[in-house]
């Protein structure tokens, strides 16, 4: 069993073996450097040069301009261009805040944790750059509660960065000052949603706020203007400043710029996290190329795959050749989301897979909106009953109908009767699976067991988490 | 005037007896579309063009214009949370048609809103089905059944039947979350109304959502109950039967309830309420949303003291004293006895005193004042030495709304949270919403201290000096100059001279001449009674002077009209000597009190809800009070008793041309008041009956004068005493209400913990407290809100008679505290 | 059980002082309480309410939203088996079943000796290393039944004491407030909040 050391990204630093697109590593360069996470290791490998350059030779607007030019899309899920988002801050309203979203919990997603554990200074440098660009008074780095090592490494890195005058008062002798406060969660997926994250940072229950009126850029933390960015998004800033926004833009396709990290898990031979050219690499490249996952396990074939985290509509073999391009994937009816690809081979029990994803959302609903609080649990119960062999013929209709109450029209992008997209996310696996694999559901209802040829899981009535209220 | 309407049920308001978020009368009053005002905006709601004021929410615009939008979490007096998702409507916007929650969507000019498209109906049905999925559907045994927004909307906007066959949520139920409120978590639909109320409105964040997702519940902290003076409001605004009030549980079904709109007379705020009765018994009050006064809220004392009306201790027949004590008799005999006593006394001038009137209506007080006039009695007062001189009504007066919108609210007097609960809510709101800054002068910390911009502590009696010091502070002077200033003035300390307050108010007026005053006298209709003629002409004839005269044997008869000096006069010794020293006592009351025990004639008065009339609140707002149930026993309204007596006094009877001679009904008296009492011309019966908010009348009394007041110097060894009221005390209305009786904290002497330590005593020990007047033994408690060198004790509590050590004649009360025994 | 120790009060006040509003320190301070006692006791919540200036009900309201906070004692080692989709596909339920058998308890409960609690949890961001678990939030990747047994033995005999602290302790390195803490955020926010 590999011990608790974060696996390095199996990056494609060698030449192209199978003709897949290649590019430089931007943010995973220190993943193989044993001391890359330390202050010395970071500085030795060129760290904090971007910050020095920005603070001494660039105006805040110039930094912002580079980010705009790069057209870097947010890596947290929504894919909104960071430069544009920063531009939404209202003029002259202070204090304003930067909030770093390190709550990574979307099923399948695994990259922010690596960035925090293996290269915390890179993130800190990115945060100070962003704070400089927008004039933030303080930044909050919110790390998921369950990530003890990431918290430890960031705490150490922050203490070292302060000691070396890279954060805090008069950074590097300039008159720019900003603090970074490390905060962390305590186990709640919804806190990844930016307004819920803000609530959590305010010491509240992590329940999302309605947008509008609570767009963070206008009314965020303490109702002050606030920028929430993902860890991966901000980790790219040092590279962008060291090179240029244009260099970043030129790396991949014009609709999805730069390099991007993808985690590929599930039924593949060599699951892993890869930093690949955004927009040009295809799903098939990731799944099949020897530099990446090296194909589906046991020589089997893809039955379905989740292209962008548990909230995404599922894709099928015919989608494998789509490029990892936001516009293309949106067009095809799903999303790249948080860069989480989960591959299911032809032995997968689709009802069980669907249930598992729904169960996640049911368990993680914050409880604020009636449709999500009541609906997701209802969906989960029906599916579980089917898995237990107690499905009824009318269940499938009820299932779809309850989905409709949460996400009217079952369209993509989803409409919602809820405040945030969590509720509708529970609808994604159901519409995906029921549409394509209806016979598997019918078979459960009729025979109380899955169709032949799929793997059964030892799912049992679990009580979830210990000693909760 | 309409009866109250439930905000969730505008469509069939007539049958609806719930007063949930009542916005009475307003709907019906405005029957046609208001004329477009200059700044109004246009909305197309369900295809019809409507004009609304800008700055509102779509939900209100729809509901005001007949397109009813179902909702649960939205409450017009709290910030919207968009939680239940029931109020979904379609709004056409630049990005196409959007389904949005109308409770959080601001209106905009030209907005197109649809509330009844198939998509909206589908969405609303879906939400309702989901709300009902885990609901126990135990309507037949639920207090709310019949007036339940969930039930009603399931009927009007629901899918008809549930397909939910899974196991429902189960919780232990119902659980008491306080002395007055039970919680049934299975019925709860998590609308956040009660929790928001506790947080936003009351500031008592003692109930909260706990756990997450499908397990979310409303709960208190383990072993820390929802102790709030305003807990009953959560029951009223709960849109299901999750919160129920102990005093009402299982008492009635809503469809058996009859109701009438009225005004709570529990204190001088005068909250608008509906009085609900079943089988001729009052069983519930609900707050009505009066924009000017209470916004739908009530305090628990006002809400639940209806129990006292039904108390089996009520005085139900007249009594006269015989050898065997107080003996029931007929009205004729009792009235003749009383009249005989008075006729004898009236042979000597100024030998009859009349105290009271503030418990009854304006009409009651008016009739008694008229009787005092014809008897030539100058000794009269609506207070018992526990308020301020009548001249406090003579300053330029502020309304509650003016206070709650002033740039500065100066607090000079009682702890409003304890004495005038809903005024506390309104002023707290003003501070929390940053409309106003509170500048507080007080001897100890009060309920509003946490919300005060500046809270200035002064020694008892030293408020003038504190004002002078404050005025020399630049920040305070700037603030007072920044905009309207309202001074809320009342009697914060019963162990100190009221002159201390008047002197401080005058000092403020010298600096801010354009300030206005909101008098914070506490008793129900004290303002009305004073204006009706129950105000003493001068210091020589006020309540204390009356009691003094009685104690010296100068009075032959003392008439107590709902007044109990033995409990309410701060100088307990004076009250006792007075009651002992006067030859005869005639008591007109609803319940037996310490003073009725001493009476020679007891005349039973009808209580609130048993009689009609008008009342005047602390702003001078005259509103109506209405009868809902038959009077107890043979009791009569006070005004009628005055009239009955007033015709039996021989040559001192009401003259034949006296207007009251012709009064047959209370409405006649209301008209007489309107036509004869200066300032009340606008408060005629028709004017008052047609408005929820009533009519504000001016007070024609001379402004109080203070010759300045400064407290005597103090001796380091002594503590200076503060005696003030708590919301719950030994008052009759509270003690006769089963559910409230135990909420009175009981007597005690509260000292700063450092002083407790310095005295070498432990909390809970008995100490002797010695003033120039007397000595009492009392239990000591530590309280950080009491500054060092000050001793605070709650007034009129069981177990300690702190009144014994107060000398009404002294400016302040200094006491020596020693370990007892 | 207990209020925060003097040392933890110092740490808590340091965190509170860094926050523009005191309540922002609530979750980190709750973690301190859990670090001290292994769970968040009622007394600790009352103490935290005092330190931050809110009601205990507010503390509890926030704390109970988050799954990591326990309000009753759990095992010294909390073993969280991820059963979410990537792990389910690669045998997480079978691993959980083995764990339950091996420890003789159901998921969600604690062994009678107070050593182990098992939970089945949602995705822990180790999807490419499925099936994965955490012991007191320290990762173990691609766990087989044999790995699990060895893990339990090592935990019991103390072989992992250095690596894995008892339940409640997360990061063993804390951010401290340095001399060059700029404090502009807190001061600016306080100015905005001042009435
Ligand atoms: C239910 C939900 C969960 C989310 N979880 C995360 C998360 O764990 N990490 C993250 O960075 N963004 C998450 N997001 C997206 C954030 O709301 C936000 O868009 C993002 O942090 C913005 O950063 P970016 O612009 O750099 O991508 C989530 C959104 C939703 C609706
Ligand atoms: S959709 Fe679900 S998770 Fe999102 S705010 Fe509503 S209840 Fe909470
Ligand atoms: S009333 Fe609008 S969401 Fe509840």
Give the label of every model feature segment:
Chain A
Residues 78-79, 83-86, 109-112, 151-156, ...:
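Short acidic, glycine/serine/threonine-rich loops at helix termini
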Residues 68-89, 185-199, 203-205, 362-375, ...:
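Conserved phosphate/anionic-ligand binding catalytic regions in large, soluble enzymes, centered on
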Residues 126-130, 279-297:
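Short amphipathic, charge-patterned alpha-helical segments
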Residues 119-133:
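Histidine-anchored nucleotide/phosphate-binding helix
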Residues 42-49, 101-112, 218-221, 263-269:
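Gly-rich Lys/Arg/Thr-decorated short loops/hinges at beta-loop-alpha junctions or inter-strand turns
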Residues 11-64:
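Cofactor-/ligand-binding subdomain signature composed of acidic, glycine-rich
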Residues 151-278:
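Hydrophobic alpha-helical positions that pack around
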Residues 1, 5, 50-67, 94-98, ...:
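Ferredoxin-type iron-sulfur electron-transfer modules in oxidoreductases and energy-metabolism complexes
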């Amino acid at each position: 069993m590999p011990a608790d050391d974060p696996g390095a990204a199996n990056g494609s630093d060698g030449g192209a073996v199978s003709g897949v697109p290649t590019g430089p590593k931007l943010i995973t360069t220190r993943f193989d450097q044993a001391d890359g996470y330390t202050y010395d290791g970071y500085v030795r490998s060129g760290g904090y040069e971007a910050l020095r350059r920005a603070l001494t030779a660039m105006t805040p607007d110039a930094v912002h301009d580079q980010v705009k030019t790069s057209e870097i899309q947010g890596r947290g899920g929504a894919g909104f261009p960071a430069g544009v988002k920063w531009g939404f801050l209202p003029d002259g309203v202070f204090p304003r805040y930067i909030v770093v979203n390190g709550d990574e919990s979307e099923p399948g997603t695994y990259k922010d944790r690596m960035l925090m554990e293996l290269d915390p200074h890179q993130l800190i440098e990115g945060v100070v750059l962003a704070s400089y660009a927008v004039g933030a008074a303080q930044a909050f780095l919110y790390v998921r509660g369950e990530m003890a090592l990431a918290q430890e490494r960031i705490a150490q890195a922050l203490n070292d960065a302060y000691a070396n005058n890279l954060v805090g008062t008069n950074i590097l002798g300039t008159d720019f000052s900003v603090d970074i406060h490390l905060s962390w969660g305590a186990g709640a997926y919804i806190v990844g949603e930016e307004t819920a994250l803000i609530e959590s940072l305010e010491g509240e229950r992590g329940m999302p706020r309605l947008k509008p009126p609570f767009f963070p850029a206008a009314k965020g933390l303490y109702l002050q203007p606030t920028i929430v960015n993902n860890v991966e998004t901000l980790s790219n800033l040092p590279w962008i400043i060291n090179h240029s926004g244009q260099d970043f833009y030129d790396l991949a396709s014009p609709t999805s710029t730069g390099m991007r990290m993808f985690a590929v898990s599930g039924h593949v031979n060599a699951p892993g996290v890869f930093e690949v050219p955004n927009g040009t690499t295809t799903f098939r490249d990731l799944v099949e190329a020897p530099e990446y996952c090296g194909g589906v396990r046991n020589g089997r074939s893809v039955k379905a795959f989740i292209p962008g985290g548990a909230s995404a509509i599922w894709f099928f073999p015919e989608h494998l050749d789509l490029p990892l391009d936001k516009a293309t994937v949106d067009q095809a009816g799903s999303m790249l989301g948080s860069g989480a690809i989960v591959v299911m081979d032809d032995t997968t029990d689709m009802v069980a897979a669907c249930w598992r994803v729904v169960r996640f959302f049911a368990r993680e609903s914050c409880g604020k909106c009636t449709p999500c609080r009541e609906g997701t649990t209802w969906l989960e119960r029906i599916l579980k009953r089917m898995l237990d062999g107690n499905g009824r013929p009318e269940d499938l209709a009820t299932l779809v109908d309850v989905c409709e109450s949460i996400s009217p029209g079952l369209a993509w992008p989803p409409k919602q009767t809820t405040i945030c997209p969590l509720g509708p996310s529970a609808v994604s696996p159901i519409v995906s699976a029921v549409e394509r694999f209806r016979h598997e559901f019918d078979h459960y209802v009729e025979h109380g067991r899955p169709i032949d040829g799929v793997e059964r899981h030892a799912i049992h009535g679990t009580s979830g988490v210990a000693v909760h209220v | 005037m309409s009866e109250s309407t439930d905000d969730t049920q505008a469509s069939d308001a007539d049958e609806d007896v719930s007063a949930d978020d009542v916005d009475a009368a307003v709907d019906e009053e405005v029957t046609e579309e208001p004329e477009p005002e200059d700044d109004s905006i246009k909305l197309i709601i369900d295809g019809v063009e409507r004009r609304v004021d800008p700055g509102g929410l779509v939900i209100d615009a729809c509901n005001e214009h007949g397109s009813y939008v179902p909702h649960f979490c939205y409450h017009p007096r709290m910030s919207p949370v968009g939680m239940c998702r029931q109020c979904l409507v379609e709004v056409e916007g630049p990005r196409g048609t959007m389904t949005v929650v109308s409770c959080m969507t601001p209106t905009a000019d030209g907005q197109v809103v649809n509330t009844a498209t198939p998509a909206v109906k589908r969405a609303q049905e879906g939400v309702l089905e989901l709300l009902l999925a885990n609901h126990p559907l135990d309507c037949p045994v639920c207090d709310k059944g019949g007036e339940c927004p969930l039930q009603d909307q399931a009927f009007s906007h629901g899918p008809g039947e549930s397909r939910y066959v899974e196991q429902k949520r189960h919780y232990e139920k119902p659980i008491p979350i306080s002395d007055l409120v039970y919680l049934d978590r299975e019925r709860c639909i998590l609308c956040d109304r009660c929790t928001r109320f506790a947080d936003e409105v009351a500031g008592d964040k003692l109930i909260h959502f706990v756990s997450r997702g499908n397990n979310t519940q409303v709960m208190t902290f383990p072993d820390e109950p929802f102790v709030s003076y305003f807990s009953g409001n959560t029951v009223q605004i709960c849109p299901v039967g999750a919160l129920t009030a102990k005093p009402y549980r299982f008492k009635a079904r809503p469809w058996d309830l009859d109701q009438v709109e009225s005004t709570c007379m529990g204190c001088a705020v005068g909250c608008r309420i509906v009085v609900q009765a079943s089988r001729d018994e009052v069983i519930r009050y609900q707050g009505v949303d009066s924009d000017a006064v209470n916004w739908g809220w009530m305090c628990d004392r006002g809400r639940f003291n209806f129990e006292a009306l039904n108390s089996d201790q009520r005085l139900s027949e007249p009594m006269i004293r015989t050898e065997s004590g107080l003996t029931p008799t007929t009205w004729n005999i009792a009235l003749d006895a009383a009249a005989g006593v008075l006729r004898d006394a009236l042979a000597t001038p100024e030998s009859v005193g009349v105290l009271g009137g503030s418990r009854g209506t304006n009409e009651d007080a008016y009739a008694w004042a008229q009787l005092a006039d014809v008897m030539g009695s100058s000794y009269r007062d609506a207070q018992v030495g526990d308020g301020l001189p009548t001249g406090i009504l003579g300053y330029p007066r502020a309304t509650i709304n003016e206070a709650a919108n002033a740039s500065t609210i100066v607090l000079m007097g009682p702890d409003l949270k304890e004495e005038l609960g809903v005024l506390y809510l309104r002023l707290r709101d003003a501070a929390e919403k940053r409309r106003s800054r509170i500048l507080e002068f007080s001897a100890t910390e009060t309920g509003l201290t946490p919300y005060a911009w500046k809270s200035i502590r002064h020694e008892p009696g030293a408020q003038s000096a504190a004002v002078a010091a404050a005025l020399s502070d630049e920040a305070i002077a700037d603030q007072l100059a920044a905009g309207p200033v309202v001074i809320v003035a009342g009697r914060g300390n019963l162990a100190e001279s009221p002159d201390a307050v008047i002197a401080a108010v005058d000092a403020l007026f010298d600096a801010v001449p354009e300030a206005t005053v909101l008098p914070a006298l506490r008793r129900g209709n004290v303002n009305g009674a004073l204006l009706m003629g129950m105000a003493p002409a001068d210091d020589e004839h006020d309540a204390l002077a009356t009691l003094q005269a009685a104690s010296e044997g100068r009075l032959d008869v003392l008439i107590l009209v709902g007044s109990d000096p033995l409990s309410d006069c701060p100088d307990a010794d004076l009250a006792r000597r007075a009651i002992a020293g006067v030859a005869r006592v005639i008591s007109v009351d609803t319940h037996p009190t310490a003073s009725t025990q001493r009476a020679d004639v007891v005349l039973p008065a009808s209580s609130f809800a048993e009689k009609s009339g008008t009342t005047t609140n602390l702003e001078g707002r005259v509103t109506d009070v209405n009868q809902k149930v038959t009077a107890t026993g043979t009791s009569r309204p006070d005004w009628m008793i005055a009239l009955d007596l007033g015709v039996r006094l021989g040559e001192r009877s009401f003259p034949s041309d006296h207007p009251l001679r012709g009064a047959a009904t209370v409405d006649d008296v209301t008209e007489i008041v309107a036509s004869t009492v200066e300032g009340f011309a606008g408060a005629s019966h028709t004017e008052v009956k047609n408005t929820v908010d009533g009519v504000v009348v001016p007070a024609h009394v001379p402004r109080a004068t203070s010759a300045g007041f400064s407290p005597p110097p103090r001796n380091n060894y002594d503590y200076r005493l503060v005696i003030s009221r708590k919301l719950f005390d030994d008052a009759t209305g509270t003690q006769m209400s089963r559910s409230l009786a135990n909420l009175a904290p009981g007597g005690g002497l509260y000292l700063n913990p450092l002083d407790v330590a310095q005295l070498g005593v432990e909390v809970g020990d008995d100490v002797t407290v010695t003033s120039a007047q007397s000595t009492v033994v009392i239990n000591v408690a530590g309280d950080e809100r009491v500054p060092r060198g000050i001793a605070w004790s709650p007034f009129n509590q069981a177990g300690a008679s702190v009144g014994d050590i107060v000398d009404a004649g002294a400016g302040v009360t200094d006491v020596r505290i020693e370990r007892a025994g | 059980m207990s209020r925060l120790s003097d040392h933890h009060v110092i740490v808590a006040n340091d965190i509170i002082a860094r926050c523009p509003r005191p309540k922002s320190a609530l979750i980190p301070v709750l973690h301190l309480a859990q670090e001290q006692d292994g769970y968040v006791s009622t007394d600790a919540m009352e103490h935290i309410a005092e330190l931050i200036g809110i009601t205990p009900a507010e503390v509890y309201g926030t704390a109970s939203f988050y799954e990591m906070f326990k309000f009753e004692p759990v095992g010294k080692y909390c073993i969280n088996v991820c059963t979410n989709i990537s792990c389910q596909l690669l045998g997480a339920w079978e691993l959980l079943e083995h764990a339950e058998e091996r420890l003789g308890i159901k998921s969600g409960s604690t062994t009678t000796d107070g050593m182990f609690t098992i939970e089945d949890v949602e995705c822990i961001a180790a999807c490419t290393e499925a099936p994965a678990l955490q012991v007191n939030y320290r990762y173990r990747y691609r766990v087989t039944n044999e790995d699990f047994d060895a893990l339990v033995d090592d935990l019991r005999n103390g072989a992992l004491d250095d690596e894995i602290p008892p339940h409640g302790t997360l990061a063993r390195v804390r951010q401290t407030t340095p001399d060059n803490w700029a404090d502009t955020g807190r001061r600016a926010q306080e100015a905005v909040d001042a009435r």
